[in-house]
Amino acid sequence: MVYHDLIIIGGGASGLMAAIVAKDFGMDVAIIEGNDRIAKKILATGNGRCNITNDTISFPFDTFHSENSNFFLETLNSFTIEDTKSLFLSLGLPLMKLEDGRMYPRSLQSSSVIDIFRMALEDKQIPLYPNCKVTSVDKKKNFTLYTNNTDYEKFSCNKLILSCGGKAASKTGSDGSGYKLSRSLGHNIIEPLPGIVQLKLDYPYLKALSGIKFDGSVTILINDSVVRTERGEILFTDYGISGPAIMQLSYYASKALYNNSKVTIRVDMFPNESKEDLENFFTTHFSMFNYRDISSSLIGVINKKLIPIILKDAGIKDIHLPCGNIDWKYINRLLDKFKKWDFNCIGTNGFPNAQVTVGGVDTSEVNNITLESKLVKDLYFCGEILDVHGDCGGFNLQWAWSSGYIAGKSASN
């Protein structure tokens, strides 16, 4: 049996942070990692550049979400963006700010972040046990951990941090096994759901729309009530819809679909213009080219591949009819589609394609100041395993750094 004062299960972002902090506080700490190397999920973040944090994060932290909306406030206040920048600089990794406050390593390489952590573990002599999947945990006086590695079948520790992640991006090793360990120690799990993920639509012309992208705004409606609107690039696919604006809204869709609610995705192709603006423009436009068919008249105004589809949706069956011969009520329907093109959302693209997990360990059972379990003494949590997630844009990694720091510090006291 291998003994350490503190063992961290999971060598992802939050677990690595917790280990470094605990070691700096003088703890005998080790990391057990199920993969063959640390932080595989970091490689995929920020399109391979690693969006480490976001410079816009501030109280009341409305880009973070949990069933317990106050849980994360203390943690994010205690280890801030400035603390994150300082800590990475101390490890040898300067950061730079790009669009929308997103911060990256100056190298713009995710691999740099992993290399910096790997060197930090070596410098601080923090043992790492890779290819070691923890299958069960017992708690008596100390914690006893059992693994599937024949060389290291059994571990013991006085204090334990669970930083096993969630279920998102499952190809990186995130299989939800931390939930099983948490349940075995008495904790409840808020149903894990895919977040920051593409959405599936029920629409007959998806194959024709596939590959079309444009800048616009997207609104999600739950049971016909508006919940949130986002602007950005919108991409249609053969299964539904994607793009940054969609990814931001997907959290609401996941939860609503799980609760069997009606989910509508409303696309506004002209977010900078009002319906009246469009009426004025098209009145002039169609008058100038009243001899042209309606289909040709829309070329240059919207994506050419969209024209026959949106005309059908507006009830204009003959797309070769001259503009001057079309009843204005049909033109009005077309303008309505430009501003409010509604789609029925029937699902998400699942955990393999999700960037974050919605749900996790019930935070009502965790101390919001120390991140120690309220049920099991000397058990701590950090990162995505908890029922906390953020919007797309570096917010989830900031939660990893902040919660990892607090868990590592608290476990060292």
Q: Over which residues does each language-model region extend?
A:
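An anion/pyrophosphate-binding glycine-rich loop and adjacent beta-alpha core
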Residues: D36-I38, L43-A44, I52-F59, N188-E191, ...
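Beta1/beta-strand and adjacent pyrophosphate-binding region of the FAD-binding site
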Residues: M1-S14, A30
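Short hydrophobic core segments
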Residues: I7-I9, I32, V134, K154-K171, ...
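Core beta-strand elements of the Rossmann-like FAD/NAD(P) dinucleotide-binding domain
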Residues: V2-H4, N149-K159, T229-R231
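A glycine-rich dinucleotide-binding beta-alpha-beta segment and adjacent secondary-structure elements
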Residues: Y129-P130, P308-H389
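A conserved short coil-to-beta-strand element within the FAD-binding core of flavoproteins
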Residues: P130-N142
